[in-house]
From Swiss-Prot:
Pathway noted in the entry: Nitrogen metabolism; urea degradation; CO(2) and NH(3) from urea (urease route): step 1/1
Pfam families noted in UniProt: Urease_gamma (PF00547)
Enzyme Commission number(s): 3.5.1.5
Taxonomic lineage of the native organism: Bacteria, Pseudomonadati, Pseudomonadota, Gammaproteobacteria, Moraxellales
Localization in the cell: Cytoplasm
Keywords: Cytoplasm, Hydrolase
Superkingdom to which the source organism belongs: Bacteria
Gene Ontology terms: cellular component: cytoplasm
InterPro entries linked: Urease_gamma (IPR012010), Urease_gamma/gamma-beta_su (IPR002026), Urease_gamma_sf (IPR036463), Urease_subunit (IPR050069)
Primary location class: cytoplasm
Descriptive protein name: Urease subunit gamma 2
GO biological process: urea catabolic process
Amino acid sequence: MQLNPTEKDKLLLFTAGMVAERRKNRGVKLNYPESIAYISMLLMEGARDGKTVAQLMSEGATYLSANDVMEGIAEMIHDVQVEATFPDGTKLVTVHNPIV
């Protein structure tokens, strides 16, 4: 399988998101990179499922709570941005204050 650099980046981000999801499901509090990867993975999957940018921007703030992450992580993450592939092309999705 031949992947271009963008596809490799998306695959790596998705893989990191899957690891973070498994840890979250086991009750492990996520660190900074795991939190970013988890939110990004769900945004990319939502885009592939046909959700709109507006839907993902509002839903993205509900994926993680302060109880899901290590102490201080919620305050460190102000925005999460990911280029997601929608049925009509690639768009930038930005979620402000993603961890409440």
